[in-house]
């Protein structure tokens, strides 16, 4: 929630001093589609998670302050990447730490002093890879998709389709999968 580590620490100290719970709600982690996919992962339906991919792209923010790096703290990575990383952490496991991170970012379209496109990879201590794609230059509305690949299957979550949940498994997946799914 802070623009940098110092601001985040300042907020954490204020929360501790006030003896309250602090945080932010990552709402996409609580949608029915996501909860269904997370339950399938936890049940072992796709085996061991080896790779997650989260994409959040759109033409850019509505609020002017987002475009100002001094006010927002950065570009599309700080705006959208935080959501994608949290999606991956839910699938991979919140107690599993990243050990290596790399990112490519560039300003391609908007005349701003921050990135408007980025791709990042995080390798976790269990060998899983988390990938994010974020953009403020995507044309075609908003694109919000998540994938989780395991040793025994794959789940695709498209947050803008009616059903928007597909699972392919060679493991434990014989239960009800999605509303109006066709065989």
Map each language-model feature to its residues.
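Active-site lid/adjacent beta-loop-alpha segment flanking the redox-cofactor pocket in flavoenzymes
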Residues: 142-143, 171-173, 179-180
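Rossmann-fold NAD(P)-binding glycine/threonine-rich loop
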Residues: 2-20
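Contiguous beta-strand/loop segments that form the cofactor/metal-binding neighborhood of enzyme cores
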Residues: 86-169
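C-terminal helical cap and adjacent loop that interface with cofactors, partners, or active-site loops
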Residues: 8, 127, 177-183
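Active-site beta-loop-alpha junctions enriched in small/polar residues
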Residues: 1-4, 27, 57, 135
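Predominantly a Rossmann-like dinucleotide-binding segment in NAD(P)-dependent oxidoreductases
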Residues: 20-23, 28-112
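Conserved strand-to-helix beginnings and helix N-cap segments that scaffold or border functional pockets
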Residues: 5-8, 34-35, 114, 145
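Alpha-helical scaffolding segments of alpha/beta enzyme cores, especially the outer helices
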Residues: 10-13, 39, 119
């Amino acid at each position: 929630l802070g623009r940098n580590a110092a601001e985040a620490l300042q907020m954490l100290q204020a929360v501790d001093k006030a003896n309250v719970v602090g945080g932010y709600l990552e709402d996409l982690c609580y949608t029915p589609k996501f909860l269904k996919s997370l339950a399938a992962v936890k049940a072992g339906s796709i085996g061991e998670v080896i790779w997650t991919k989260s994409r959040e792209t759109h033409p850019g923010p509505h609020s002017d302050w987002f475009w100002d790096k001094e006010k927002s703290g950065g570009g599309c990575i700080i705006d959208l990447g935080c959501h994608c990383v949290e999606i991956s952490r839910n699938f991979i496991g919140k107690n599993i730490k990243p050990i290596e991170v790399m990112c490519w970012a560039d300003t391609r379209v908007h005349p701003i002093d921050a990135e408007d496109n980025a791709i990042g990879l995080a390798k976790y201590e269990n060998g899983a890879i988390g990938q994010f794609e974020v953009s403020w230059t995507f044309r075609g509305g908003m694109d919000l998709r998540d994938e989780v690949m395991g040793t025994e299957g794959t789940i695709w979550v498209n947050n803008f389709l009616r059903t928007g949940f597909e699972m392919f498994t060679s493991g434990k997946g014989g239960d009800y999968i999605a509303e109006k799914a066709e065989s």
